[in-house]
Amino acid sequence: MVKLNSRTIQYYLLILYTFFSGVVFFEPSVGDILFIVLLPILIIHVKFKKTEFSLLALLLVPTLFSFFWGFVKFGFLNFKFVFIDIYLFLLFVFFKVCLDNFYEYDRNIIDTLMKTWLAVAYLNVFTGLFSYATGRFNIMGQSIVGFGIRLIGFFKDPNVFGPFACVCGLYVFEKFYQSNKNLIFAIFNFGFMSLGVFLSFSRAAWLNYFAGLLFIVLVYSFKNKNMYKWRTLLLVFLLVFFMVMLIFSDITIAGISFKEFFKGRLGIKSYDAQRFASQGKSLVMLDMSKIFGIGPGNYERITNYSAHNTYLRYMGERGFFGLITGGLLVAFITLRALKIKGKYFFLAASLIGLLVNSYFVDTLHWRHLWIVFAMIVSYSYRKEPYGES
């Protein structure tokens, strides 16, 4: 029987938040409400070290400076996005500290949290398959499938669900390389998560996934060449088989040809021109305010269209000051990811994929991005890899 004490309760609340970070079709989500309610308790009981204060400063200082400067110079006030930014920045550092604190309580806490994400990813994909099979794209007021036949799951956008499934897919893909135990189960998990990524029909998510998979393949090619060769050949065979089946299939979902829809996603879309034009306006914002930018959440005030590029959005809204501090943060997290040893190379692979994804989609407000950041920083400081003696 589990003995309930303060530490145990905090541990299960962390797992609960992780689960609900994959169910975000309404805002604030259950996880958001949980974090906000517990924030006063976290502030009182959680102790920050120099690393946490430094990370928070790199995020909060340019955000607050640009917010006040945007109001003083342009009259822009966007409290909503400032609060969202601050919430996610606090989530990042508190999640990191909580992981540090629970290392002795659960030496496999990364696995525990990833299995939690895997469970909610399965829920998303299974619900999507149910929608495809029954034609019920809307379940209890939530569009599970939309934008044609793109899988949204319990997210608000397939471009967010796809990258979330990528992290889970990379986790189980690394399991595929790590041992001969439960190999069939690992292949099934990988195939199912890959199906979720594919059905999102997000081109950025596909590129994200490819970059992450390639990184893991290269890492394990140096770790165990014999295992690498046959498992990589098996992977290539399965992927080629899947693609051939897709090309020659003639499935129709809700009157839409699956094959034709897939082909359509491979080309340049009409709205891509709007995206490129919007991205070019980031230079206009820099011209308006080079140092501090125009303020968080104000990009659309100038363009009337989302940036679809996290780096250009950050630069336009926070100026060169934000670009420098943001660059330092990304560089720090990347260096920590490259220090990872042991059995969690998927974290570095996920980071690479997310950084690639960020060039094509606004990722700043993705909860799973900040949780991955927290996992990387926390795990990379461990003297002994989680779950290894």
Regions inferred by a protein language model and the residue ranges of each:
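A juxtamembrane structural motif centered on a specific transmembrane helix
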Residues: 1-9, 178, 340-342, 375-389
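Hydrophobic transmembrane alpha-helices and their immediate junctions
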Residues: 53, 182-186, 213-222, 231-232, ...
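A membrane-periplasm/extracellular boundary helix in multi-pass inner-membrane enzymes
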Residues: 220-266, 283-288
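N-terminal signal-anchor transmembrane segment
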Residues: 1-47, 61-73, 127, 354
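Long extracytoplasmic/lumenal interhelical loops at the membrane interface
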Residues: 138-140, 263-318
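Alpha-helical transmembrane segments of multi-pass inner-membrane proteins
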Residues: 111-142, 153-223, 328-332, 336-339, ...
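Hydrophobic, aromatic-rich transmembrane alpha-helices
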Residues: 15-18, 34-47, 167-178, 320-340, ...
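Aromatic-anchored transmembrane helix interface
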Residues: 57-67, 76-100, 112, 116, ...
